[in-house]
Amino acid sequence: MKNISIYLLALVSSLACFNEVTAQQVPVRSNYLMTSFQDNVASAGNKPCLDMRMGFRNQWIGFEGAPSNSFASLSGRIFETNQSVHGVGGRIEIDEAGPWGTTSFSLAYAYKLKMTNGGWLSSGLSVGFVQHRLRISSLDFPDVQAAYDPAVSASKQLMFPTIDAGLWYEGEHSFIGISMINATASELSEMTLSTRTSRHIVATAGTSIDLERSFRFRPSAQMRMVSGLPISLDVTALVSYDNQISIGVGYRSQTALIAHLQLALMDYITVGYAYDFGISDIRLAAASSHEVTIALSACDKRSKRAQHCSAYD
């Protein structure tokens, strides 16, 4: 009975930690212009060639148990005509925050239809699974002996199906997309006393404005919505030169100022780096976050076939 009481206390403590990171059940990404497929399955096959993305985010440097995220994705086309495209892809993602962790894998399909104005409208769906982990051994126990009891210190793991859906529209210079992530909203009562994961709505939009001498201005925004929490908004302004280098700044609502740098290495690789300067109260313990994203594309960027919306990537 004593062990059960301590176990429940550990769960209550972990639930408090879980509530602190609820807003990040869907990871926040500063380089969202480079991770459209990760955030919206309808963008699978946007490029007419194999496209691989990898990324890592280390948040709140110096804060014990701070969130970290890594992902990899591969997408492409399986069939296309002048009026329609069938895109497919796969995604894997690992997210850690204190004693909590998730690993997700999904396969996606997107259908794209060319509109009369020359733009493309896409709808997409992904199906996969997500594994939730609770490492009880990493929690602090009031009873030292109980911490070494296998019945108390063992980790908990649960696996659930997950479904994402999205819509995406892009023209030559602008795009807009909206997606629902974690439509299944799994119940975690076996781990955390009647806690349910949340459905997330992610909306992203951007445009591109040509300037003089091969310069281009690319403003964009991403909004993340989840029931019971304030809306999170990122606003980004990038200036690109000759599709080779981009620098810019961003703002995340009441949370961070962001510095951006993107470099095209050769014609097939793009590397993006973002540095978040914390402006919320947590900056007193951890003021910064780092994020690196790598894009590997089989398309030669200077090929006409590779051209797509200039507002992202």
Regions found by a protein language model. Name each.
Residues 24-313:
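Subset of outer-membrane beta-barrel
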Residues 18-23:
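Sec/Tat signal peptide C-region and signal peptidase I cleavage site
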Residues 7-16:
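Bacterial N-terminal signal peptides
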Residues 1-6, 115-117:
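Positively charged n-region of N-terminal signal peptides that target proteins for export
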